[in-house]
Amino acid sequence: LFLKLMDEASEIQAHAGGTIMLPEHLLWKHFQGMGGQAILAYLKDVVWPEMGKKYGDIFGKEFLIESPEILADIVGQLSALNLTSADTDIKGDAFEYFLKNAYQGVSIKDLGEYFTPRNVVRTMVSMVDPKFGEKIYDPFCGTGGFLIESFRYLKLRTKTTDDTDRILRKETIYGSEITSNARIAKMNMILFGDGHANLYRHDSFAHPQTGKFDIIITNPPYSQKTRYGNLYPVPSTSGDAVAMIHCFDALNEGGRACILMKEDFLTEGGDVGAVREYMFKNAKNFSVVSLPRKMFEPYTPTKTSILYFEKKGGRNS
C-alpha cells in the first residue's frame, strides 16, 4: 500500500514538473508486470534495502511476505486502483485493517488507543484550531491519527510555497510512541504529505518536553504505571497523572491542549487530584466535552471526555 501510494504521488509530481519521490527503479510500475517469484525477489533484494536506507526504521530489517502467489495477487489488485483519488479515510481504514489483523494475539482492549474515532479526532483538531508556524505535539501518537488530521488541517489553510512546505513537513509535527507503531505513524505521515521527521519511538514519560509546543493533542493510555514521575512538577507513579502533567508541561505559555481523558480525571483524588489542582492553578479557559460511554466500544467501555485548556504565563505551585 505504501509503495503504491508513493508511486502515484511520484507520478503526480512528474506531471507537475517536480522531482519524483522515488528513483525510477523503485516505482511500482517497474515491478508490477513481473511474475510472483520475480516480484518477491526484486522487492526483497532491491526495493526493501533501498527504502530502508531512505526512510530508516519505517521499513523493517526483514521482508516478511514469503508467498509469491499472495504477493502477485496483492500487486495485481492494487495496480488496478487509483488510491490517491480515494477518500483519505479509505487509506486509514486499510491501515487499521492491517493493524487489527497483525495484532491478533493482543486483546482488543489494548488496541483501543490506536483507533480513536475520526469524528472525535476532527472535533479535537478543530477545537485547537492549528495555525501555520505552530508546533503540534502528540506524546502518545499511536499510528498518527491526530497528527495526520492536524497536518491536513494546516495544508488546507496554508498557501503553498517552498518555505511553507518545508516548515509544514519538518518544523510543525512532533510525536512519540512507545510501541513499534511509531513506524506505522511515520509511514502514515509520509503517505499524507510528510511530517514524519520528528516522530520518535520512545517512552514519552522518560522525556519531558518543557515549554516546547504551541499545541498538544492526544489520547493517552489509561491505567498505566511509570517510574519516571519524579521528572515532573507533580511527581507520581500513576500513568494517568503523569500523562496529564507531561502534556501540560510540554506547552509553552499561552499554548493550548486538547486531551482525550478518562472522565474519572475530573473527580479522582490522590496523585490525579494533585495534578488536576496544579493544572487548574496554571491554566485557563477550561472546556470539557463528555463523550458517550459506548464511543470506544468494542475496544474499551471506559467513559471519556475531551479536555481543552490553555496554559497561563508563569507557574503557580
Each language-model region and where it sits:
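Short glycine-dipeptide loop
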Residues: 251-257
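Short strand-turn motif at the edge of the Rossmann-like AdoMet-binding core
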Residues: 261-264, 293
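Flexible, glycine-/basic-rich loop-and-beta segments that form/coincide
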Residues: 297-317
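Conserved short secondary-structure elements within globular domains
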Residues: 280-293
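Non-catalytic, mostly N-terminal accessory regions of nucleic-acid modification and defense proteins
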Residues: 1-128, 132, 198-204, 290-294, ...
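Acceptor-substrate binding/catalytic loop of class I
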Residues: 264-269, 297-298
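Conserved S-adenosyl-L-methionine
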Residues: 110-218, 223-230, 237, 241-242, ...
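Structured alpha-helical segments in the cores of large, soluble enzyme domains
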Residues: 243-251
